[in-house]
């Protein structure tokens, strides 16, 4: 029973608190109640002092006179300087496409107007290209000669400091490939393709030898040939045997010659491989 009364009593209390809070919020919205923010401890101590309240309530004539002496003069904001040059557009680039001073899409002044230790974008690219041709190992003697003449006679070398040019080339030089392209003979490439596909010379030799053996066995096992051979006279039989022996001898010589050629090819390939390995070690 006691719990029941507590439950009912707490519900009534909550309803009263809720009603009071709603009424208070309504008064705040109407402006009838002023909400004051919390005070700091120092402000609370100053509120107790009556001297501070008197100073705040007193009118200071000197401050009023000083305020009246102040004069503020306002003017319109100063107009900012705007350039009269047109910004680069597709139409302007198309109009100046054949103009040397607009080669890179923007105006480049004459050489006489460029100050010392300054260079144009076009001059920087030309200098980097010719200096790379001068120092590159892959350049031909004619290219190196032309590059040396350009670097010696160009106006950039006299206008810009040599140390600055060295720094520009060190940090902005173009990339260069150091590897060399290997040229392969088309016959060697065809032989490699045949070897990959199983059509190498060794395979051909074995296939040809098998074909010759099949032919010889076919002749030996052919009853018709044996019958004809038996009907021949002794002199004709000797000629047939000599022809077969000669055929075998020619085939044997051909195979030996081909094996010798393959041995030379293999030896050359091994020497080339050894030379390539030595060059790689030297690098």
UniProtKB/Swiss-Prot annotation:
GO biological process: mitochondrial respiratory chain complex I assembly
One protein family per Pfam: UPF0240
Protein name: Uncharacterized protein B0035.15
Record InterPro entries: NDUFAF4 (IPR009622)
GO cellular component: a single term: mitochondrion
Superkingdom of origin organism: Eukaryota
């Amino acid at each position: 029973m006691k719990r029941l009364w507590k439950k009912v009593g707490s519900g009534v209390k909550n309803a009263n608190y809720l009603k009071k809070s709603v009424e208070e919020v309504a008064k705040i919205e109407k402006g009838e109640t002023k909400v004051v923010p919390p005070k700091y401890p120092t402000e609370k101590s100053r509120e107790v002092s009556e001297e501070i309240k008197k100073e705040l309530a007193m009118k200071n004539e000197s401050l009023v006179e000083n305020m009246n002496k102040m004069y503020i003069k306002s003017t319109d904001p100063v107009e900012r300087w705007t350039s009269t040059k047109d910004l680069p557009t597709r139409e302007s680039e198309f109009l100046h496409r054949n103009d040397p001073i607009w080669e890179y899409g923007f105006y480049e002044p004459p050489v006489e107007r460029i100050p010392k230790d300054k260079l144009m974008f076009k001059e920087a690219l030309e200098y980097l290209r010719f200096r790379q041709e001068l120092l590159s190992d892959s350049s031909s003697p004619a290219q190196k000669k032309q590059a040396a003449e350009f670097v010696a006679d160009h106006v950039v070398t006299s206008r810009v400091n040599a140390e600055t040019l060295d720094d520009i080339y060190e940090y902005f030089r173009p990339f260069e490939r150091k590897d060399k392209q290997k040229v392969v003979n088309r016959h060697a490439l065809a032989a490699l393709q045949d070897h990959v596909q199983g059509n190498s010379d060794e395979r051909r030799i074995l296939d040809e030898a098998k074909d010759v053996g099949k032919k010889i066995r076919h002749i030996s096992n052919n009853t018709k040939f044996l019958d004809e051979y038996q009907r021949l006279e002794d002199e004709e039989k000797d000629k047939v045997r000599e022809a077969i022996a000669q055929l075998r001898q020619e085939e044997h010589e051909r195979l030996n010659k081909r094996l010798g050629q393959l041995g030379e090819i293999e030896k050359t390939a091994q020497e080339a491989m050894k030379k390539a390995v030595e060059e790689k070690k030297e690098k």
